[in-house]
């Protein structure tokens, strides 16, 4: 994958997350802000999730209250470099824990 392909895939992922949050109908208020390729989700309890791209490594990084994770793209999905867990599943798990209700990204 070249840098251009990486940016296109990372942009698609960020847009999908934004669209999912815009359509969220739960009780929790989840705000998001994207600045310089870094997306920050802020929850009512003040906790945050940070998603950012690491261009030199062609990875997307996810930072949650539970820990930090690095994801590589293969076979149409982003997978954790340690656990093999898919990005949207991990994001759903973390967002649900931090929101105190089910938040699904896929």
Curated annotation (Swiss-Prot):
One of its GO terms (molecular function) is ferrous iron binding. One of its GO terms (cellular component) is cytosol. GO terms for biological process: iron-sulfur cluster assembly. InterPro entries: CyaY, Frataxin/CyaY, Frataxin/CyaY_sf, Frataxin_CS. It holds the Pfam family Frataxin_Cyay. Keywords: Iron, Metal-binding. It comes from the Bacteria. The keyword Ligase does not apply. SUPFAM superfamilies: Frataxin/Nqo15-like. Disulfide bonds: none annotated. Transmembrane segments: none annotated. Belongs to the frataxin family. Involved in iron-sulfur (Fe-S) cluster assembly. May act as a regulator of Fe-S biogenesis. This is Iron-sulfur cluster assembly protein CyaY. It comes from Yersinia pseudotuberculosis serotype O:3 (strain YPIII).
